């Protein structure tokens, strides 16, 4: 399971700066939920081969009213659900009463905590950081988040216990493409392995869109899973099931009750739990409330699923009982706001009455099969060549970008690796054209497809061309002819 790193500290110690650096963007919102957390941010980060979820919990002032009352409920939940806490302090401002209050709270929770002294640029870092040892939380790690100093070392150290689980051997910071090409036998064996595994299905959506109702509808009336027992709040519930001879694992993030009790409880909603479920799933089923239309929360969750490369099916719930005018408006909004995911199937259902629920699994299987389908190197190369025939790559410095061959780079999501010369200079518009061309040609449905470009080495680069004997004779005759003309 992907680890969660929570950034904790009083205001203005650099949490947002570190968040933006880890997520590599200044607009790295994955899910920002008004009404649940006023200023919390969730992002997906990659650093030194590690993949993790990072949470900016917002500032805590630690006033006399007490740390428990000043820390928002969702910030408390973020700390409780985090695997690692980075307790950020300001080396320039020194140790404050708020820092002491936060440290006391973290000690009581017995979380894996690392003290980070930020803003060490331009000062005597060792002297400035010395007083933070008195917090009693172990070693103090020096960092200048704005400049990136100490960030990589900090994350590597904090996430080392998760390296084996993530299959990490020391890698560089940049993600590398696996250039290994499967043989036909290996590719067939890998596809069979994937097809034999249960499909892990994450049912996600904002609160009260009907996730629990749908899960109970899928599992049947008698299935009961109590979601508020000790130990069930941190991780999602994994429920195995079988349908039409196909095995599934339903990843439930809402907590499941008897259908008769669904309306009697307020759904517990955990953003982190939802994001972790997306990372662990093969297929994501996003539930949208037809009565409310597409909300920003829906787009945030959708963005996270797409960034994770997960196969996707969308279900518009509560479709029964609304008039035709509202249905037309919702369909128009779906076309307008979700046009960029035209590869995903959209279903209109009623989880309460079961209308349309059975058809969801046709699209779920279709999306998973598309995401794990094996395509040979010869087929991918042929499609690549056809795309060039229909629309040539652009000229770069007077030379045409040359694409040589393509092969599969991974499954779920499907990854196509394209080798060629000057591919790094291909404009984004041409890359999008190729991605859409591959999608249409392969009839990929319900899953994003990724293209990766590898620069091919030119074997003649920096080498003097060696002429054949006939070429050498022609060259001498040409030079002799030029000399004769100059002497006349």
Swiss-Prot record:
Q: Name one GO biological process term.
A: ribosome biogenesis
Kindly list the positions annotated as binding GTP 2: 205-212, 252-256, 317-320
Q: Which domain of life is it from?
A: Bacteria
EngA-type G domain boundaries: 3-166, 199-372
The UniProt keywords, alphabetically, are: GTP-binding, Nucleotide-binding, Repeat, Ribosome biogenesis
Q: Where does GTP 1 bind?
A: 9-16, 56-60, 118-121
All copies of domain KH-like, residue ranges: 373-457
Q: What does this protein do?
A: GTPase that plays an essential role in the late steps of ribosome biogenesis.
The record describes its quaternary structure and partners as: Associates with the 50S ribosomal subunit.
- HAMAP family xrefs: GTPase_Der (MF_00195)
**What is the protein's name according to its record?**
GTPase Der
Q: Which organism is it from?
A: Shewanella sp. (strain ANA-3)
Taxonomic lineage of this organism?
A: Bacteria, Pseudomonadati, Pseudomonadota, Gammaproteobacteria, Alteromonadales
Name the gene: der
């Amino acid at each position: 399971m992907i680890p969660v790193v929570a950034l904790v500290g009083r205001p203005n110690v650099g949490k947002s700066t570190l968040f933006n650096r880890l997520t590599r963007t200044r607009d790295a919102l994955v899910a920002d939920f008004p009404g649940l957390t006023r200023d919390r941010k969730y992002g997906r980060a990659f650093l030194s081969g590690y993949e993790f979820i990072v949470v900016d919990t917002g500032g805590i002032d630690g006033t006399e009213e007490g740390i428990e009352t000043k820390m928002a409920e969702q910030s408390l939940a973020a700390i409780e659900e985090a695997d690692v806490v980075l307790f950020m302090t300001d080396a320039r401002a020194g140790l404050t009463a708020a820092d002491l209050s936060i440290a006391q709270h973290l000690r009581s929770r017995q979380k894996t905590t690392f003290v980070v002294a930020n803003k060490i640029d331009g000062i005597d870092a060792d002297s400035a950081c010395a007083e933070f040892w008195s917090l009693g939380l172990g070693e103090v790690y020096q960092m200048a988040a704005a400049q990136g100093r100490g960030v990589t070392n900090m994350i590597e150290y904090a996430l080392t216990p998760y390296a084996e689980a993530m299959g990490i051997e020391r890698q560089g910071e940049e993600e590398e493409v696996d250039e290994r090409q499967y043989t036909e036998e290996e590719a067939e064996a890998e596809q069979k392995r994937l097809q034999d595994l249960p499909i892990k299905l994450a049912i996600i959506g904002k609160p009260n869109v009907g996730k629990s109702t749908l899960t109970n509808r899928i599992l049947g009336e008698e299935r009961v899973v109590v979601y508020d027992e000790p130990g069930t709040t941190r991780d999602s519930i994994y429920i195995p099931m079988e349908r039409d001879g196909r095995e599934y694992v339903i990843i439930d993030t809402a907590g499941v009750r008897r259908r008769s009790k669904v309306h009697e409880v307020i759904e517990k909603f955990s953003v982190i739990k939802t994001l972790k479920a997306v990372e662990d799933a093969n297929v994501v089923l996003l539930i949208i409330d037809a009565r409310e239309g597409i909300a920003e929360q829906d787009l945030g969750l959708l963005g996270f699923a797409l960034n994770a490369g997960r196969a996707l099916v969308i279900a518009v719930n509560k479709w029964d009982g609304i008039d035709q005018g509202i249905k037309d408006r919702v369909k128009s909004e779906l076309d307008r706001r979700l046009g960029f995911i035209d590869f995903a199937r959209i279903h209109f259902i009623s989880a309460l009455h079961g209308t349309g629920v059975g058809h969801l699994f046709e699209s779920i299987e279709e999306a998973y099969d598309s995401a794990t389908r094996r395509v040979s190197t010869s087929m991918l190369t042929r499609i690549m060549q056809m795309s060039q025939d229909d629309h040539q790559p652009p000229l770069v410095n007077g030379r045409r970008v040359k694409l040589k061959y393509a092969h599969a780079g991974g499954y779920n999501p499907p990854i196509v690796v394209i080798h060629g010369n000057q591919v790094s200079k291909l404009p984004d518009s041409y890359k999008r054209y190729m991605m859409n061309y591959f999608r249409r040609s392969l009839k990929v449905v319900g899953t994003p497809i990724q293209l990766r470009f590898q620069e091919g080495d030119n074997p003649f680069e920096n080498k003097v061309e060696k002429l054949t004997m006939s070429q050498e004779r022609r060259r001498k005759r040409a030079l002799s002819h030029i000399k004769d003309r100059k002497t006349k």
